[in-house]
C-alpha cells in the first residue's frame, strides 16, 4: 500500500467512488498496450515503478511478483524496439515509511529512497537508459504538505482543506529539501556505480507554469519573477547553482532549510537532464500585503494573485487550495498558449545555462464525455509542438516532448471525470475497450526497418542521445513516435521533433 491509496479512499466521494485498483489495467494488459504502441508506430514508453509494488515495506525484501511484472514490461518494450523511460517516484511513497517516520519529512527517507533506487538500477539498468528520480517534486511538496490536496494530505488551517495534521508554514520546505537530497543521493549512486557500465542518464522532473505579468506595473513584474523563483527556482537553482533563490531565503527565512557546504556541492549539477511538466501560462498580480501576515504558507510567501487571462472579471485560477477541492480546479479545458512553452524554454536557456530538457507532460483536459473528435486536443498538440520547433530555432536544448496522456486513466484529483487521453477507454466495458480519438488523423512517421532500434542509437556529445534536431526527417511537422506512462496505470504520447532540413535556422 502507498500513500496514494489513502488519498483515493478519502476523496472517493468526490470522484464518484473511483480508485486506482484497476484503472486502465496495464498490469494485466501490458502486452496489448505495447502492441498498440507498435501499431501506432511509437518508439518509447515512460512509466513509473511503484516503490510499494517492488518493495512493499519501503525497504527490505523485494516482491518477486512486482519484479517479474516490471521485467516483463521492460522486456516486452525492448523486444518491440521501444525505449523504456522510468520514473522512480510519482506521489506513491510506501505507506509503511510514512507511518514509521513521517516519510519525506524525515532524513531517513534519503537512505531508503537511495536503497530503492539501487534495486531499480541493479535489476533494470541493463535495459533502462533514462531514469527520472521524482515526478513534480515541487507539486508533491506543496500539494502533499501545504494544501493537503495530494498524498500524504498534510496541511494546517487556514491554508488547506480538511486539515487534520501538518504545518503548512514549514513542511512544504522541509519535504522538498529532503526530496532534493534524495535525488542527489540516488543520482550520485547511479553516476558512481552504474553509469559507466549501463551508459544511461538520470534527471528530475518539476511542474513549470509560465508566468506573465498581469499589467505593465513594476510591482507585477517583480511579483512574476518571484513566482518563477518560488515554483521553478526552488528546484532549478539548487540543481544548477547549489542553493535556493535569494528571494526564497529572504521571505521564508529559517523555515527554508539550508544546504551544508557538501550538500550544496553535491546537489549542484546532479542531473543529466531536467523534465518539465507544462500545461499553460498564468498571469501574475502582485499582492505583497500577504507578506505582513504573521503566519504564512508557501503561497502567501509567494505574495501573488493568479489568473488564466488578463480579464479580471474571470474567476481567479485556484493555484493554492479551493473550498470545493478538487472539483473546481478540474473543470473545462486548459487555455491553449503555445507561446508560453517557447518562453519557458527560453527562460531555462537564459537563467540556467540551457540544460538538456524533456517536456515530460503537456496536454489538454476535457470532460470524459466529450467528443472523440477531440478538436481542442489536436489544436493543443499542433500548437505546442510548433512552439517547441520555434524554441529549437532559438537555440533551446530541448530533447523531447511528452503528451499527457496516451490513455484515459484515473486522475489523482478527480478520478475519471477528466479525459486527457489520446485513446478513449470504455470503463463500462469489462474488457476496457480502447477507441481512437481524432489525434490519430495527425501526420506521423515511424522508423523504417533499416533504421537502428532506439536503444542502439548513437549518443551525441552531450550524453543524452540524439537531439531533437537530429532524430527524425520530417517535413515541418511534429512526428508522433513514442509513448510515456507516468504511473503504472497511465500513459502519454512522446514525440521527438525535427523539422524539414529546408527550414531556416535549424541546420
Regions found by a protein language model. Name each.
Residues 1-13, 38, 57-59, 67-458, ...:
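Active-site region of glycoside hydrolase catalytic domains
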Residues 2-35:
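Aromatic- and Gly/Pro-rich amphipathic surface segment
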Residues 29-50, 351:
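Catalytic domains of carbohydrate-active enzymes, especially glycoside hydrolases
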Residues 49-62:
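Glycine-rich, proline-tolerant flexible connector loops at the mouths of alpha/beta enzymes
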Residues 463-465, 476, 505:
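Residue-identity detector for glycine
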Residues 494-496:
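Aromatic (phenylalanine/tyrosine) cluster motif
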